[in-house]
Amino acid sequence: QVAGNQTNKGVAIICQSGTIGNTISFNHRSLPIGYIISLGNQAKLSIEDTIEYTLKDKRVTAIGIYAEGFTSIDKLIRVFKISKEKKIPIAIVKVGRSKVASETILTHTGSLSGKENIYDALFKRMGVARCETLSELTELLKYFHTHGVISNDQISIMGPSGGDMAMLGDAAETLNLKFGKIKPQIKNDLKKVNHPGVIVSNPFDMQTYNWNDPDNIEKTFKIFFKNNFSSISLMLDFPNMEKCDTDEWDAIVDKFIKVAKKYKNGSLISSLSDTMPKHIRDKCINNGISPLQGMK
């Protein structure tokens, strides 16, 4: 079976495995998918040919690839250059780092996986994001779909939990992302609309003093978005909707979306993939906000 919904624009998925293509279509992550193309052993069409084809479609916002091997490095470099020129980002899961994976690839599609350090260098040079798992791939494609590539490495994150902020600090460091410095005037303005016990920093532990104060929550978001960072995110985990009332969480997300959609660099992050319900993910996507499930 093939799962999914029609979309006016979305990402193109190119796979050397039909099952993996299907698996991506089964996602519970609200990823807008325009194409799923399975190539197998590339006897007729190569990954490079298919990238070139999808780059010609103006509805394609980003390209996600599962690859076991390539047919032409020269052609691969050429289509990567085209993607950069068109500002259509590419994310890839390239398997074959281990001996076991290399042997499996040989029996699966007959591909030679090649030296992975060479691919690492190539992807980095061409601005292609290498992912290790399908979860990483789908989450990154959501970000690419809504925002494209970040303009710099300066980010900011806010949320009601100091523990979440600490974990995100570690996660950001592994990705070579930096928490930008909040300007003094913005810091002073944030202090005016938050409880004296709240320490303004980046990442910003907002705590829950304003949890039921929608006006000050909205003011906090408006002030925080004045920071000139490439990405500004709110971290929030929803309880189980079957057992709990989520009206308070919905209200906070609505305030965040109201502010963030004007700036086109906002994301909503949940620490677990399960703690962001579908109606919230869809609302974010429809308003240009990236709903990111999980810290990586």
Predicted regions, residues:
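Catalytic-core regions of core metabolic enzymes
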Residues: Q1-K296
